[in-house]
Amino acid sequence: MSDEDSMLLNFTTNEDTAGSSYKQAAKVTGGRWKDRRRMKMKLEGKTVSRKRKANTTGDEGIIPGRGENSIKKLHKESSYSSEEQEKYKGRNAHNTQGRTLPADSQFVSSLFTSNREITTAVNTNIHDENVAINPSNAPLKGDQFASLGVTSLLVSHLEQKMRIKKPTSIQKQAIPQIIGNAGKNDFFIHAQTGSGKTLSYLLPIISTILNMDTHVDRTSGAFALVIAPTRELASQIYHVCSTLVSCCHYLVPCLLIGGERKKSEKARLRKGCNFIIGTPGRVLDHLQNTKVIKEQLSQSLRYIVLDEGDKLMELGFDETISEIIKIVHDIPINSEKFPKLPHKLVHMLCSATLTDGVNRLRNVALKDYKLISNGTKKDSDIVTVAPDQLLQRITIVPPKLRLVTLAATLNNITKDFIASGQQSKTLRTIVFVSCSDSVEFHYDAFSGSDGHHKNLTGDSVRLLTKGNTMFPCFSDSRDPDVVIYKLHGSLSQQMRTSTLQHFARDNEATKGKHLIMFCTDVASRGLDLPHVGSVIELDPPFAVEDHLHRVGRTARAGEKGESLLFLLPGEEEKYMDYIQPYHPMGWELLKFDKEILMPAFKDVNVNRNDKFIRKDEKSSKNKDVGDKEYEWDTNATTWHLNIERRVVGDSAFKNLAVKGFISHVRAYATHISQEKKFFNVKFLHLGHLAKSFGLRERPKAMGLQSSKDGNSEKKPTKENSKNKMFRMARMAEKQIASEFNY
């Protein structure tokens, strides 16, 4: 065939012919139309147009068609420096006047604006200062312990060593009846907090033992089993009992509480003891697993005491108590060895309040009991009231101002203590909050602000040192003489014990100082802390019984005391009518601004904790910043902004603030049903409440459960079909672009 007969074919090929077949093969299906189109364009090598950023300050960031006003607005948004923004937001945050701050900046609200109106204008339960007050829980003047049947050895020991000369009203009623009972009846002891219920059952038990002619030592067995709801109360009863029996060294008490080594407790039980004092869980554990404790109880046990019965039931120990009583009743009692002791077990139940739980426990533990009470009778019921010598105060504070009002209250107490010149005495103040995370936040907020402090006992006790600026009354020329404590159930038992001992001890370390303890209700029951001048309830109690126990930490044994209750505007104001029957002597209703904040922040200057200087201070270079005095509301705002700036700059402190706020809201939702009409989480303004924890906005992780280390844990989400399709498409595109794809 010649060349002329041949046929020539011309083919036009693109440069990416090889790759196009693969790209066409990767067909995108499923999902939305926009997603399919975007993925198809990406596979074809086309670029996807992106939206321009609206906050770009250059000319290329301006959206066409908006005109000159858009350019001016963009330049105006970016013209504020960070210092001017914070100054502007602090002055008038609720009115932006049309100006828009950058998206990454935080909104700082004003303390004194947009607060809920306080409707209570008149105090309906006024405290009359002209009425003569007789302390309701004070020792009686005309009575002696000897006339009640207490042995002379104990009477002299009480007067010389413990400095107790007169019995209280409940002790006068209880001691003779328990001594002369001979095992016929059980007893229900009901009295006010701070009236001496512990001695009302310990003194007759020890007196009965000392009146026996039989020789007694630690090997004679346990005569009494005392059960308390908390470790702190059990430890206090143990120390009181140890002090009482120090006059007769052959009587030995034993403490059984959680957090201690069981091996050491078993060793003490093997050596022998005459009084077993402990918490329900640990006592039941030893009754079930320690053989020697049953041997101790079978020889001499005659008394079972349940102290703070309402708290035992509130903490859910009803089944534990029933098991303990059942085991003890199954132990045979040998009454021939000590014939002068009661021939059967005597049960005693002690409580400062009468609740449904106490009534259930009374039906389980007591039989043929006698009621011993010094409460007032009303409509055939016994009503427990606060001590007559207690000065109760109530203040209604908006949620945003809770923290700065608390600081002003503590400042006023400290300032009055310094002005009194009583350097030889020790002043104690207890601040009750709702949860342990809130304790941690307030403890660090008031003790770790500027580094001028030192730890005294681990990390739970801090002494404020010279140069500290937490309270406006502090001066650079002298030591603050303020010690901050924290106490809650999440601390280790050793730290809880050492903290309480340091707070209650009168020595050179606490002499002339103001001791402030932030705590939960773990310190509200039964603890006899000496010379507590004031009790502050920053968070209202979960039940009115807890309120009586809280205020009972002060005004004990006839001494004067003060208590301050914080309430929020709105529904919580009606709580005053609810607690009015428990305060027959009335209360003082304080205005938070004029009577608390103004005395604390007036005639002082609170400096900022950053390097920013006001414009009026820049004009005078030689003038000291601290020489100029500002209005009290400006000082209060500056103080609170210092806390907020610390939250922003310190991640660890911010974590404490977030955890404290979230735990506080969760705890607020646990009020009993009868009080939900006053304390309902739906009534809270969460944004305003977050500001009282130094937060400039409500945390977004409110519903997430937090792990123990504070990090929120999220479960991995399952991949849906659309995301899986995109992932497979990306893998196909990557495979096509690979150099190994032939």
From Swiss-Prot:
GO BP terms, alphabetized:
rRNA processing
Motif Q motif: where? 143-172
**Substrates-to-products reaction catalysed:** ATP + H2O = ADP + phosphate + H(+)
Pfam families in UniProt: CTE_SPB4 (PF13959), DEAD (PF00270), Helicase_C (PF00271)
Lineage, top-rank taxon, reads: Eukaryota
The answer, when asked if Nucleotide-binding is one of the entry's keywords, is yes
**Quick check: keyword RNA-binding in the entry?**
yes
**Location(s), subcellular:** Nucleus, Nucleolus
Q: What's a single GO MF annotation on this record?
A: ATP binding
Q: Where is the Helicase ATP-binding domain?
A: 178-372
| Helicase C-terminal domain span | 405-605
Map motif DEAD box onto the chain: 307-310
Principal subcellular localization: nucleus
**Where in the sequence does UniProt note compositional bias of the Basic and acidic residues kind?**
710-722
InterPro entries under this entry?
Answer: DEAD/DEAH_box_helicase_dom (IPR011545), Helicase_ATP-bd (IPR014001), Helicase_C-like (IPR001650), P-loop_NTPase (IPR027417), SPB4-like_CTE (IPR025313)
Gene Ontology annotations for the cellular component aspect, listed alphabetically: nucleolus
- Annotated function: ATP-binding RNA helicase involved in the biogenesis of 60S ribosomal subunits and is required for the normal formation of 25S and 5.8S rRNAs.
Q: What is known of its domains?
A: The Q motif is unique to and characteristic of the DEAD box family of RNA helicases and controls ATP binding and hydrolysis.
Q: Which family does it belong to?
A: Belongs to the DEAD box helicase family. DDX31/DBP7 subfamily.
The protein depicted here goes by the name: ATP-dependent RNA helicase DBP7
